[in-house]
Amino acid sequence: MLTTLLQSDLPGLPLRHCGKVRDVFDIPRKRLPVDTRSGEYLLIVATDRLSAFDVVLPDPIPGKGEILCQISNFWFQKTEHLMPNHLTGINVASVLPDGIDKTLYIQRAVVTKKLKPVGIEAIARGYLIGSGWKDYQRTGKVSGIQLPDGLQEAEKLPDPIFTPSTKAAVGHHDENIDFDTTVKMVGAELAERVRDATLRIYHFAAKYAAECGILLADTKLEFGTDIDGRLYVMDEMLTPDSSRYWPIDEYQVGTSPPSYDKQLVRNYLETLDWDKTAPGPTLPQDIIDRTRAKYTEALQRLAGINID
């Protein structure tokens, strides 16, 4: 049975960051089942909050955080031969404070290594859609990469491309940047490592998803480094919130294909007289239910996990 959580409440765990969807807590040393310095590990909780147009909406999607967490964990495990990840294997229940309903957190939280974020969004695109399509229409390029003339919306690219963006604060918009700008921001060596890892993961995941009847149009990854400079993939991985997944049997070049994400919500919001600033409008129950069904189907098709 899926739980619903809009805001984490974990007395005794210092809140480090409250994002659009995830709450991040430091884990005091006394709560760790391993001998380590305080602050080396974090508890990341995927709530059921939903954001659209960079605004967190007032209505949760019940169980969404649990679904996202399970999809991420599936992909972290499936790709660990390609790139180490932030997971530690420490049991979530062992670090949660006493006196709370731990069932709210067991399936939606993970204990992770504490890493230094690289500071950019690492995006791989295999198809021309979204902001990439808009950039191409305007300039013929995406993130400074020249593409062939005459491509259509949602068309498969000759080869997947790395198209990083800035990592904006909550309420602000990420901006696409070219590779030279990425080098200036994080350094040439780290930029190349992130680019290579992003494309390596995308190639692997796109092949696997296709075997499940799903096209992986693009995905956004986040990376961090430890004190020794080792690179890890972190945060979330290949979820419907960070990726565009399209059903193969509904894919058609020249249109924006249906996807396993919050597109239903975005489409609904576009019909409203709303200026896309906070506070966001409430959602009809039908939109909430149909959006949840999309996330549930993605989990089932990709990971083979049934939750209903």
UniProtKB/Swiss-Prot annotation:
Q: Which gene encodes it?
A: purC
> Which is one Pfam family of this protein?
SAICAR_synt
GO biological process terms, semicolon-separated: 'de novo' IMP biosynthetic process
Family as reported in the entry's similarity comment: Belongs to the SAICAR synthetase family.
Ordered alphabetically, the record's keywords are: ATP-binding, Ligase, Nucleotide-binding, Purine biosynthesis
Write down what this protein is called. Phosphoribosylaminoimidazole-succinocarboxamide synthase
Q: List its EC numbers.
A: 6.3.2.6
Alphabetized InterPro entries for the sequence: SAICAR_synt/ADE2_N (IPR028923), SAICAR_synth (IPR001636), SAICAR_synthetase_CS (IPR018236)
Q: Which organism is it from?
A: Xylella fastidiosa (strain Temecula1 / ATCC 700964)
Question: What PROSITE patterns does UniProt report for this protein, alphabetically?
Answer: SAICAR_SYNTHETASE_1, SAICAR_SYNTHETASE_2
What is the reaction catalyzed?
5-amino-1-(5-phospho-D-ribosyl)imidazole-4-carboxylate + L-aspartate + ATP = (2S)-2-[5-amino-1-(5-phospho-beta-D-ribosyl)imidazole-4-carboxamido]succinate + ADP + phosphate + 2 H(+)
What Gene Ontology terms describe what this protein does at the molecular function level?
Answer: ATP binding; phosphoribosylaminoimidazolesuccinocarboxamide synthase activity
Name the top EC class.
ligase
Q: Would you name any one GO CC term?
A: cytoplasm
Q: Does the keyword Acetylation apply?
A: no
